[in-house]
Structure formats: C-alpha cells, structure tokens
Curated annotation (Swiss-Prot):
One of its GO terms (cellular component) is fungal-type cell wall. Pfam families: Hydrophobin. This is Class I hydrophobin MPG1. Residues 1-19 form the signal peptide. It comes from Pyricularia oryzae (strain 70-15 / ATCC MYA-4617 / FGSC 8958) (Rice blast fungus).
Length: 112
C-alpha cells in the first residue's frame, strides 16, 4: 500500500501543476508590468462602450468618464505567471496613478 506521505505529496504536486496556467491564456501579470515600466502602474479601467447614435461607432466611456483602479501590489508580486485577465475583466492600462474623473489622460490601455 501507499504511505500517507506519498499520497499527500502526490495530491500537493497535482494541485501545484493545476495552478500553473497553460500558455496562451493571455498575457501574464509580469508582461503587463514590463509594458508599464517603472514609472507607471498596472491598472484596471472600466471598458463600457457608448454607441454614437448618428454614426453607430462605439466610443469607450473610460476615456470620457470612467475610472481606473490600480491592481493591488500583492497580486502583482505573487502571481507573476497568472494571466492578467484573471484579475481584470475590463481594460488593462498603464496609469500614472489611480484615475477617477472626467478625462483619464494619464492612462494608456495596453490590453483589452
């Protein structure tokens, strides 16, 4: 029979392997940090869109009246290999700081 240590070790290894994301699930947290560089922070901005009734074109609301929230540093440092979309279902941007207001000119979308 298998010893209890062997079973526990096998279960722990299986859980670890399952926790590592497969390639191709989206850009990782570290990739987003590299795009932002040291001077900007990785942020999650709302990506609701407003349709222009005359032209039918979609205009991102976050450019006009949205808000961007910094992704917490503990998520950025611990989860380097996890796809960034697991933490931000909206638009991932590089921002100079937390943006809430009429025009978020200090945020640049890097992933959507």
């Amino acid at each position: 029979m298998f010893s209890l240590k062997t079973v526990v070790l096998a279960l722990a290894a299986a859980a670890f392997v399952q926790a590592i994301p497969a390639p191709g699930e989206g850009p990782s947290v570290s990739m987003a940090q590299q795009k932002c560089g040291a001077e900007k922070v990785v942020s999650c901005c709302n990506s609701k869109e407003l349709k222009n009734s005359k032209s039918g074109a979609e205009i991102p609301i976050d450019v006009l009246s949205g808000e961007c929230k910094n992704i917490p540093i503990n998520i950025l440092t611990i989860n380097q290999l996890i796809p960034i979309n697991n933490f931000c279902s909206d638009t991932v941007s590089c921002c100079s700081g937390e943006q809430i207001g009429l025009v978020n000119i200090q945020c640049t979308p890097i992933l959507s």
